[in-house]
Design a protein with these regions (language model features):
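C-terminal recognition in membrane/secretory proteostasis and scaffolding
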Residues: 1-80
Length: 80
């Protein structure tokens, strides 16, 4: 789900989608429920639709910028 204005202020980020349930390749790569996906392949995301569009343009992997609490890190997630 998209971040609320309050969450954006608390996390100090203007973009992001909250992971409500981690499954499949994302979960295997280490993404957890409660993480915030800030960008995919260096493209900021604010909605599931934006995330799907980036994934559709990707080949075999997506570089996911994750924010967990105050820490940001990249997670490579294989596609397919």
């Amino acid at each position: 789900r998209p971040l609320t204005q309050q969450e954006m202020a608390k996390l100090n980020t203007p973009h992001g989608v909250v992971v409500e349930r981690a499954e499949g390749p994302a979960a295997k790569a280490g993404i957890r429920a409660g993480d915030v996906i800030v960008a995919l392949n260096s493209e900021p995301v604010d909605s599931i639709e934006q995330m799907k569009a980036v994934v559709e343009r990707s080949r075999d992997r997506v570089a996911v910028l994750v924010q967990r609490n105050a820490t940001r890190f990249f997670v490579p997630v294989p596609l397919g």
